[in-house]
A protein has these predicted regions:
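Short Gly/aromatic-enriched secondary-structure transition segments
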Residues: 80-81, 181-183
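Conserved double-stranded beta-helix
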Residues: 2-4, 18-19, 39, 187-289
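Generic beta-strand structural signal
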Residues: 128-130, 134-136, 150-152, 161-167, ...
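Short, conserved beta-strand element in jelly-roll/cupin
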Residues: 159-174, 220-221, 228, 251-254
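Short, solvent-exposed loop/turn segments at secondary-structure junctions
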Residues: 69-71, 139-140, 159, 172-174, ...
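A short secondary-structure junction signal
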Residues: 147-151, 164-165, 175-182, 190-194, ...
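Non-heme Fe(II)-dependent double-stranded beta-helix
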Residues: 2-60, 64-156, 194
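Active-site region of the double-stranded beta-helix
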Residues: 128, 156, 169-178, 184-186
Length: 289
């Protein structure tokens, strides 16, 4: 995989030479585990299954849980998504609706964001405390598959190691608007030039290298399917004209890259202590009374 200076001009190239060593150092310390931390969200057989998924995720960068959320919760999440995105067209993507403040919009989403088993996997992967930092509900209407802009092209998320959970709230097939992920690309340290703006796009790198095809996995499955992935790995959205795709995407961070997330105080206060700690570890919560 090409990891040199992105074609962003001489200024970016020079900045990359100066800033890359500092970026590598920060990311190295970000990835170091906390030896005093151990996730304790589940026990027994569930803990063993979570541990196996953690090992797979460390190896591949992504794990899939087909049909993980089931009725009646699945129906509640689907209803919450409909309420959250209705009347909210996505300004950055055509034929799409989204709500970046999903937890504020509907408390039902906490049942997915703070699911014990998913938290066990995330905690096992990070090996340190972590918090929810974004929760985005999205509905993609049919659009031409040739649309390859923004997150609908091969890229990494420019913030180093970062765990995302994507919950499919509609059936998604290999012919639909699925996400694709390049397995075993998640441990890369990107230089400064390939961590900023257009430099984080790897569309040409992936498309022009046929040997990578066998490492590409597709996030498909029935509604309720969950993908847990490290967004430092290369991934891409894909548009298509055959299916509507509905998803809830949650981002969890540890130590770095906390973002503002709007939450209702009464919803946080109603959480069990351990789950409340996951939310309140984010110092940038925006409290809405």
């Amino acid at each position: 995989m090409h990891n040199g200076t992105a074609p962003n001009g001489l200024g970016t190239a020079l900045a990359s030479i100066v800033k890359t060593p500092f970026g590598y150092a920060k990311e190295y310390f970000h990835r170091r585990p906390d030896p005093s931390y151990a996730p304790n969200f589940v026990s027994g057989e569930a803990k063993e299954r979570a541990g196996a998924l953690v090992e797979e995720m460390r190896r591949e960068g992504i794990v899939l849980l087909p049909g993980y959320f089931k009725q009646p919760l699945l129906g509640k999440l689907q209803g919450a998504l409909d309420r959250a995105v209705s009347g909210h067209p996505d300004k950055g993507n055509p034929n799409a609706f989204s709500n970046l403040n999903s937890l504020e919009a509907d408390a039902t989403f906490y049942d997915a964001a703070l699911d014990d088993f998913l938290l066990e996997v995330i905690g096992g992967y990070y090996q340190k405390r972590f918090a929810v930092t974004t929760a985005s509900a999205m509905r993609l209407l049919p659009a031409p598959s040739e649309l390859r802009t923004g997150s609908f092209q091969w890229h990494h998320d420019t913030r180093g190691r970062q765990v995302h959970v994507m919950v499919l709230l509609s059936d998604v097939t290999t012919k639909g608007q699925r996400m694709t992920y390049l397995k075993r690309s998640h441990n890369t340290y990107y230089n400064y030039a390939r961590s900023k703006d257009g430099g984080s796009r790897f569309e040409v790198d992936v498309v022009s290298n046929p040997s990578l095809k066998e490492r590409i996995t597709e996030v498909v499955g029935p509604a309720g399917t969950v993908a847990i992935f490290d967004s430092n790995g290369l991934h891409s959205g894909n548009r298509g004209e055959g299916e509507i795709r509905e998803t809830l995407t949650l981002c969890y961070v540890s130590w770095r890259h906390f973002k503002k997330v709007r939450v209702k105080r009464k919803d946080i206060e109603a959480l069990p202590p351990q789950k409340r700690q996951v939310m309140e570890f984010n110092p940038n919560l925006v409290w809405v009374d």
